[in-house]
Amino acid sequence: MATLKEKLIAPVAEEETTIPNNKITVVGVGQVGMACAISILGKSLTDELALVDVLEDKLKGEMMDLQHGSLFLQTPKIVADKDYSVTANSKIVVVTAGVRQQEGESRLNLVQRNVNVFKFIIPQIVKYSPDCIIIVVSNPVDILTYVTWKLSGLPKHRVIGSGCNLDSARFRYLMAEKLGVHPSSCHGWILGEHGDSSVAVWSGVNVAGVSLQELNPEMGTDNDSENWKEVHKMVVESAYEVIKLKGYTNWAIGLSVADLIESMLKNLSRIHPVSTMVQGMYGIENEVFLSLPCVLNARGLTSVINQKLKDDEVAQLKNSADTLWGIQKDLKDL
């Protein structure tokens, strides 16, 4: 006796398992991981989304919650498991997992604890998706991108840190607010380490090709009567402020990550400030990852733009690199 499905649907092609074209995996279903997931789904970037975490109930709940929204999405398959086999054939893997900094904990100690987590995660990712591109989001992102590159054995163009993509977006938003234009029309770059020692490239800030530093030569310096330097200070402090107010940041970083993924999956060759291996650039001698303007396309991070930086900006970049190396050189088991 034929089932209802057999009566309803007459097959034309043989049934076979299809390999997804644009599968994306998100590792870690905390606030940041789920913001990445919903941003990816909202932009219809993937034909299969896989979620992985160690907390099975939370993981299943998040998966079901997203699946129940399938009618409103263009992603036919949403899966989740604590076993990494669920991630097989991913084009892009987003790593948001990691331990949180405890009160009074040193950065080195936090990084070392995250290294121990990544030693389990990264080999599993590469085992099931040897051709994937990994985007590292977990903090401290620049050091953990280096750790991921070391542990994965992947070429450096396929290991990318979310880096200063969000810092630069915050910078452009805050400047645009002051000027009364849309952030997309206000161009400016934050480079270096994501966070406290980031570098605002004031020499490159422009609106419609007009260099703002030509209009106000003191822009970004301590002598500036309009105090534009405050904008960069606000960028650095903004995450701390949001965390103080709501406990964590997630929406903006989720949108930022989806933006990076779009550039790669759609082969756009857009330029983003993301964390890459900078050894040999700007006189940096060690194997550190920092944000520079990078071209992202289907192959990953394919080139770096040589920005004309002023001497003080180069000095700040080198300072960032030294800070990171100071922590990296003492990491164990890499």
Swiss-Prot record:
It comes from Sus scrofa. It comes from the Eukaryota. Interconverts simultaneously and stereospecifically pyruvate and lactate with concomitant interconversion of NADH and NAD(+). The lineage of its organism: Eukaryota, Metazoa, Chordata, Craniata, Vertebrata. GO terms for cellular component: mitochondrial inner membrane. Its EC number is 1.1.1.27. The modification N-acetylalanine is found at A2. One of its GO terms (biological process) is carboxylic acid metabolic process. Homotetramer. Interacts with PTEN upstream reading frame protein MP31; the interaction leads to inhibition of mitochondrial lactate dehydrogenase activity, preventing conversion of lactate to pyruvate in mitochondria. This is L-lactate dehydrogenase B chain.
